[in-house]
Amino acid sequence: MSDTIARPAETARTLPRILPPMAMLAELTHRCPLACPYCSNPIALTQAKEELSTEEWTGVFAQAADLGVLHLHLSGGEPAARRDLVELTQAASSLGLYTNLITSGVGLTEARMNSLADAGLDHIQLSIQGVSPESADRIGGYKGGYERKMAVAGWAADAAIPLTLNAVCHRQNMGEIDEMIELAIRLKARRIEVATVQFHGWAERNKEVLMPTREQVECATRTVAEAREKYQGILVIDYVPADYYSKYPKACMGGWGRVGLNVTPSGRVLPCHAAETIPSLSFENVRENSLSSIWYESNAFNAYRGEDWMPELCRSCERKKVDFGGCRCQAMALAGDASATDPVCIRSPLRDRLTLEVEQLSAPSVVPMNYRGRA
């Protein structure tokens, strides 16, 4: 695709007032025992020898706390692949950061879960790929993964750590959403996030087998609405719908450089998980610059803040403060221009072409899933 929207003339930019970030995603490692075909991590994974050390990560956490970060998400890859996970959790907790562990469950034991609880872990977010050993292990590419997840959920409950289930949904498992919600109830989770796959990183290679159909998306939306009513006050159900079938794009990350930031395993600081797919941007590293200077002053974080960068189609739109122009990485992937109107938007001149491509991708296919390799 190529964008046909005229760009605003190059003028001095006016940046909005920049507030401190509320949340930070710490990608502790890219190592992971699973081989999920929907993995959104980059094609080229960071190797273990390139990862930030224990001391470097604890220093980053201290900077984050000083910067004003409240929520720290410990992620990966699989964060349990880090031998120092308990130590890192304790360091973050001692700084007053709310800690959320985002995990596949593989690599955790009951003893380690208890150690994490003692270290001050506030919350655990457990991924599920399906509602049975057959579907979950097939999608995750890891035999025995489902049973391990069920054990981890039980250990979390025993340790009094609040639980969220994270269900990434796509064509292969979208018919299980109602059962996923029921599973969350049985596991006494407080929340479930039903999130449609985002086609970044490795997932881009599996579009033909993962793209849901329009009928699946409509059914999923109804299922979530009915479950929200049924379990109101019992289970929080967050829903990230398939934006390819929506009229308007999502407010990705709450707007570029507005709410949170990501730190990669090697220390690069990003406005969002997939930001490195934008080739025109260069991202600074916490090994060389402070988190504060990167957040407030770096060219990458300021690139899409405010409205001056927007094409006229977005700058003149009443939704510009609702979706902030949509996803910059999606614009890069679909339009070849990170400054373009997100092609998902019904007002984009590329929307009709995108709709046709999605219909073709969601058609029945015999293409096998391309499983993620391991770092």
From Swiss-Prot:
Cofactor binding mode and count: Binds 1 [4Fe-4S] cluster. The cluster is coordinated with 3 cysteines and an exchangeable S-adenosyl-L-methionine.
HAMAP family for this protein: PqqE
Enzyme class: oxidoreductase
PANTHER family reported in the protein's UniProt record: PQQA PEPTIDE CYCLASE, RADICAL SAM DOMAIN PROTEIN
All copies of domain Radical SAM core, residue ranges: 18-235
Record's keyword terms, sorted: 4Fe-4S, Iron, Iron-sulfur, Metal-binding, Oxidoreductase, Plasmid, PQQ biosynthesis, S-adenosyl-L-methionine
Domain of life assignment: Bacteria
Keyword Chaperone attached: no
Pathway: Cofactor biosynthesis; pyrroloquinoline quinone biosynthesis
UniProt protein name: PqqA peptide cyclase
Cofactor(s) this protein requires: [4Fe-4S] cluster
InterPro entries given in the database record: 4Fe4S-binding_SPASM_dom (IPR023885), Aldolase_TIM (IPR013785), Elp3/MiaA/NifB-like_rSAM (IPR006638), PQQ_synth_PqqE_bac (IPR011843), PqqE-like (IPR017200), Radical_SAM_PqqE_MftC-like (IPR050377), rSAM (IPR007197)
Enzyme Commission code: 1.21.98.4
MF terms (GO), sorted A to Z: 4 iron, 4 sulfur cluster binding; cyclase activity; iron ion binding; oxidoreductase activity; S-adenosyl-L-methionine binding
NCBIfam families according to UniProt: PQQ_syn_pqqE, rSAM_more_4Fe4S
